[in-house]
């Protein structure tokens, strides 16, 4: 017989305690620290904290938006599926347009990826929304382009696409964007849908 922890809440408590003991969270505000713990929990890498970049008002702004009923816009279904609905403060709508039937033709017309083309279907929902990009750098680049073109501004953007082509650059573009968007990013190549969903869940509710 194997001896291992079987109690779910106890596993969470021990995991979060380990993260707080091993990760250098001292330089983070309390609200960002809570989100960082969840992000680290999703990937198992305590050094992720070194690459987390954020605007000071990001977490508070995103929480206000969610409490007011703002939708959550996700680049891929994996991010949307990772959102724990019971944590949402206003039964917020979670939207992913990547599987919309119009997206393949739109991508061909625009000469871009489906992930980037799917952003075009966000336009009427972007104002004051909470955006989470966890997979496709092209989606994050296109989001920034749309804002530069005059599209409505979201309340906050979680930008954590993962990969070797464009991921680091897209997150740098968000973090350094002159529009001053409220954002949370993981600089460099690391990121992913699980980290994006973890950040959303931590922002949605202050309860661990």
Predicted regions and their residues:
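Charged, compositionally biased N-terminal leader segments and the immediate start
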Residues: 1-30
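N-terminal glycine-rich anion-binding loops that anchor highly charged ligand groups
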Residues: 27-41
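A short, well-structured juxtamembrane/interface segment
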Residues: 50-65
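Buried hydrophobic positions in well-ordered alpha/beta secondary-structure cores of metabolic enzymes
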Residues: 75, 158-159, 199
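Short glycine/serine/threonine-rich phosphate/pyrophosphate-binding segments
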Residues: 79-82, 138-143, 164-168, 192-196
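Long, charge-dense
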Residues: 88-126
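Feature captures the catalytic cores and cofactor-binding loops of soluble hydro-lyases/lyases
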Residues: 125, 139-157, 166-169, 174-176
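C-terminal functional extensions of proteins
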Residues: 165-208
């Amino acid at each position: 017989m194997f001896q291992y922890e079987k109690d779910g809440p106890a596993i969470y408590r021990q995991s979060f305690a380990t993260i707080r003991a091993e990760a250098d969270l001292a330089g983070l505000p309390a609200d960002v620290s809570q989100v960082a713990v969840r992000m680290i929990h999703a990937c198992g890498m305590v050094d992720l904290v070194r690459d987390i970049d954020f605007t000071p008002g990001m977490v508070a702004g995103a929480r206000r938006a969610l409490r007011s009923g703002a939708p959550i816009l996700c680049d891929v279904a994996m991010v949307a599926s990772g959102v724990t609905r019971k944590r949402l403060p206003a039964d917020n709508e979670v939207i992913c347009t990547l599987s919309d039937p119009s997206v393949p033709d739109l991508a061909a017309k625009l000469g871009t990826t489906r992930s980037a083309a799917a952003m075009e279907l966000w336009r009427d929902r972007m104002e004051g929304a909470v955006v989470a990009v966890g997979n496709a750098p092209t989606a994050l680049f296109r989001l920034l382009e749309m804002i530069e073109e005059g599209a409505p501004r979201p309340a906050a953007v979680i930008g954590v696409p993962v990969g070797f082509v464009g991921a680091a650059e897209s997150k740098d573009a968000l973090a350094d964007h002159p529009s001053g968007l409220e954002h949370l990013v993981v600089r460099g190549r690391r990121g992913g849908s699980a980290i994006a969903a973890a950040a959303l869940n931590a922002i949605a509710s202050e309860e661990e």
